[in-house]
């Protein structure tokens, strides 16, 4: 399976906008490896993880080029790459610096909160990078105006869609008893961090 996928261009204000999806090669180790293996333990999927990031950049560039060839005026990347130093060379900032043709990157993975950061691409053009953080604290907003891309984070949104709000509340009410049911108790504290504050998950026994 390809690491990058493409959504056929849709018309927005008379322009064709293509959306491409990018998953981090860290998926191999930051999820369950068996998800990507056959019954014999052989890996059957790729995330274009080789050559110190070059395979990822090339695969994304191929996808961007295909979108442009298909008539896209703009290309927006929906990425799950993050900006953590430990994720180099697969960070969203690395990707932008080594590709062209992407007009904006809406990122995830590292749970970073970024309203808009301008990152230079391979041609030196500044590309907006945005990430909404985690747990629905923010809603990301992308605006395209006269060919210019800007991003921002919305934190105060009092107006709700009545139909959606009613639907969500019906699910919450339906599951209220279930989610408040005690299924087990532990005599020890279950923590996600060591005593010194460093993260224990995926680093040591918890």
At which residue positions do the language-model features occur?
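Short, solvent-exposed, polar/charged sequence segments at loop or secondary-structure edges
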Residues: 81-82, 86-91
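Conserved beta-sheet core of the metallophosphoesterase superfamily
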Residues: 90-143
């Amino acid at each position: 399976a390809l690491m990058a996928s493409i959504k056929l261009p849709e018309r927005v204000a008379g322009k064709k906008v293509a959306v491409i999806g990018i998953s981090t090669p860290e998926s191999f180790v930051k999820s369950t490896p068996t998800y990507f293996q056959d019954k014999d333990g052989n890996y059957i999927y790729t995330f274009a993880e080789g050559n110190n990031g070059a395979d990822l950049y090339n695969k994304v560039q191929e996808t961007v080029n295909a979108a442009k060839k298909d008539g896209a005026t703009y290309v927006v990347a929906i990425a799950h790459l993050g900006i953590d130093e430990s994720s180099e060379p697969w960070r969203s900032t690395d990707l932008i610096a080594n590709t062209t043709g992407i007009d904006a990157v809406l990122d995830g993975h590292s749970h970073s909160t970024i309203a808009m950061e301008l990152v230079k691409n391979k041609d030196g053009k500044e590309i907006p990078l945005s990430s909404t953080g985690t747990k629905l604290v923010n809603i990301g907003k992308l605006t395209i105006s006269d060919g210019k891309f800007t991003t921002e984070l919305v934190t105060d949104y009092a107006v709700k869609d009545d139909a959606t709000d009613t639907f969500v509340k019906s699910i919450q009410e339906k599951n209220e008893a279930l989610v408040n049911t005690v299924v087990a108790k532990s005599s020890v504290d279950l923590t996600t961090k060591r005593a010194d504050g460093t993260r224990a998950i995926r680093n040591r026994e918890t």
